[in-house]
């Protein structure tokens, strides 16, 4: 991963978007330079890496029933109130993803001309691996484009995006129609196939290096390690490619797309299982995976070539405190930006595993007692503790500090809750004793793939049928909930009560996905692929004395056509072959 950052910096100095369409400006390096300078060639590909959508947090939860923001200018807050249009779209990926694909296509068109190494065997291995990375990246970007821009046009056809496999130049025909969703999925899977031919499952894996070495005459251990060794961990690999295939199949099998996607739940389950089987199925689930963001020992001791067991693909580890500055409550010197909703709080079950609405142990006067441990870990509620001094935070409307409900516009909570997930509590924002800590962004967590498998397998085979694998949707739910401490005293009686009910299991799986992946950018898209209710108002909790009163905080104004995102308005205006999705 260090190598990517170096290359990106190098590429930033050498390339610009204009150079892709026009001859290089005098005194700048042209594309021909890459043929004798492999680092420059890698810089072209590195430009695609810099645009990865999962490299950070969008907090699009603010446009769902899971969160609001106290920032009136937050773009997700604005579109949730009815301001989402084809030319005001914070969910847009058209420009960034297509730009990445342009760099990928430019790289693929020139990679065979590059002198990758003096040794011919090493040079061929490098060329094949770099091209495989490019194919994997292009498959990934197709997934993100489909998630954000696929939809039904006015003629009732489910369309994807234009499929681009050659670099565009000044004389190219830019007025290219969208391809069908089916054809886009075929293109994605063909790119994935080409990627898997040249990539190891993971860099440095002995068996994988031996497999790849067999393709090249004269490839000894030293040469193979040079090309496929641990130095390249963090770049596109076989397991990352397969994970994106699983994500794409889950999207395509979902209600919003399944009528015309050509992908069913069995396919989606098989794709997820292919990833999970490499870690031993449910036995490979990380017991501490639900607190990956604050497992201090794991994070502090993480080397550039390692990832915790929970993490399939991650970004760089770096010291920072920006997340905490944005989201710590005011008395901890934060801005309290992301405020979880009562809707989300209600989604966390009781410690015994039963939903709040079905549990005799739930006490409206003590609503946070005997709850799912993930509630305390992910959401800071009234009386909860936070920060490196373990300070008690009071969010009640009659509170005396700036942490109180609506106390200070733009800083205090609007729902009665503050964000806790993703934040390091051992950070200090005190101006007199500031202390940052290491963070990293998980691009893909194994928990996401477990949840994808559970959802697809339940729909394909039912809760307990394993569908040819060694584990079922029920098995995943049992393990996932148990690791968080749910139902340990009663054998998770609620799960046992629904293990033969496909509909109730589907509801539970969706709820577990909501909890486990909250604030990581999933629910905005999940609600759409499920065709769920988009207009449930965001609620909060007004606490005064011992009285807890639920309240409405923000309405959600979305129309039914907004299950699918728009094609950018400017693009539709420029190109008449580019058909807009219905309603936009």
Regions found by a protein language model. Name each.
Residues 1-27:
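Bacterial Sec-dependent N-terminal signal peptides
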Residues 18-77, 96, 131, 150-161, ...:
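An aromatic- and glycine-enriched ligand-binding surface/loop that stacks and positions planar moieties
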Residues 37-43, 50, 74-151, 169-186, ...:
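Conserved, well-structured interaction surfaces
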Residues 97-100, 182, 187-189, 209-223, ...:
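Long, intrinsically disordered, low-complexity segments
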Residues 115-128, 256-264, 461-472:
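Structural helix-adjacent loops and short alpha-helical linkers that scaffold large soluble proteins
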Residues 141-150, 245-257, 448-462, 484:
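Extended, well-ordered alpha-helical segments in internal regulatory regions
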Residues 368, 373-480:
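C-terminal substrate/ligand-recognition segments
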């Amino acid at each position: 991963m260090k190598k990517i950052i170096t290359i990106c910096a190098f590429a930033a100095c050498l390339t610009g978007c204009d150079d892709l369409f026009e001859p290089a400006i005098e005194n700048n390096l042209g594309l021909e330079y890459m043929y004798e300078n492999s680092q420059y060639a890698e810089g072209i590909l590195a430009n695609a890496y810099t645009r990865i959508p999962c490299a950070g947090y969008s907090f699009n939860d603010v446009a769902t029933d899971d969160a609001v923001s106290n920032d009136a200018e937050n773009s997700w807050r604005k579109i949730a109130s009815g301001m989402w249009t084809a030319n005001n779209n914070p969910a847009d990926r058209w420009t960034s993803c297509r730009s990445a694909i342009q760099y990928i296509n430019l790289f693929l068109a020139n990679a065979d001309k590059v002198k990758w190494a003096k040794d011919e065997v090493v040079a061929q291995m490098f060329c094949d691996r770099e091209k495989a990375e490019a194919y994997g990246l292009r498959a990934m970007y197709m997934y993100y484009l489909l998630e954000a821009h696929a939809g039904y046009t006015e003629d009732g056809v489910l369309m994807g995006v234009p499929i681009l496999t050659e670099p565009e130049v000044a004389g190219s025909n830019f007025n290219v129609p969208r391809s069908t969703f089916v054809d886009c999925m075929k293109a994605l899977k063909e790119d994935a196939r080409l990627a898997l031919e040249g990539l190891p499952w993971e860099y440095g894996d002995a068996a994988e290096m031996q497999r790849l070495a067999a393709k090249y005459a004269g490839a000894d251990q030293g040469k193979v390690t040079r090309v496929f060794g641990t130095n390249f961990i963090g770049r596109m690999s076989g397991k990352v490619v397969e994970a994106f295939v699983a994500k794409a199949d889950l999207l395509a099998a979902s209600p919003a797309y399944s009528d015309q996607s050509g992908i069913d739940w069995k396919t989606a389950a098989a794709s997820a299982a292919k990833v999970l089987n490499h870690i031993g199925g449910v036995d490979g689930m990380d017991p501490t995976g639900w607190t990956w963001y604050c497992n201090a020992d794991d994070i502090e001791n993480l080397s550039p070539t390692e990832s915790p067991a929970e993490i399939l693909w991650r970004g760089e580890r770096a010291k920072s405190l920006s997340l905490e500055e944005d989201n710590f409550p005011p008395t901890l010197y934060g801005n309290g930006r992301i405020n979880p909703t009562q809707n989300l709080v209600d989604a966390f079950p009781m410690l015994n595993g039963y939903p709040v609405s079905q549990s005799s142990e739930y006490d409206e006067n003590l609503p946070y007692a005997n709850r799912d441990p993930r509630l305390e870990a992910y959401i800071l509620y009234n009386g909860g503790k936070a920060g490196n001094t373990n300070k008690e935070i009071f969010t009640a409307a009659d509170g005396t500090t700036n942490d109180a409900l609506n106390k200070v516009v733009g800083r205090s909570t609007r729902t009665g809750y503050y964000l806790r997930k993703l934040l390091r509590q051992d950070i200090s924002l005190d101006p007199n004793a500031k202390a940052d800590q290491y963070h990293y962004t998980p691009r893909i967590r194994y928990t996401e793939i477990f949840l994808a498998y559970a959802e697809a397998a339940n729909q394909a085979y039912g809760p307990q049928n394993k569908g040819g694998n060694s584990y079922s949707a029920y098995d995943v739910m049992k393990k996932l909930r148990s690791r968080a401490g749910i139902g340990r005293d009663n054998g998770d009686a609620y799960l046992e009560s629904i293990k033969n009910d496909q509909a109730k299991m589907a509801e539970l799986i969706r709820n577990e996905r909501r909890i486990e992946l909250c604030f990581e950018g999933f629910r905005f898209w999940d609600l759409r692929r499920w065709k769920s209710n988009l207009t449930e108002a965001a609620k909060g909790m007004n606490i005064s004395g011992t009285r807890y009163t639920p309240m409405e905080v923000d309405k959600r104004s979305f129309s039914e056509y907004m299950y699918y995102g728009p094609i950018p308005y400017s693009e539709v205006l420029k190109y008449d072959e580019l058909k807009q999705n219905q309603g936009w």
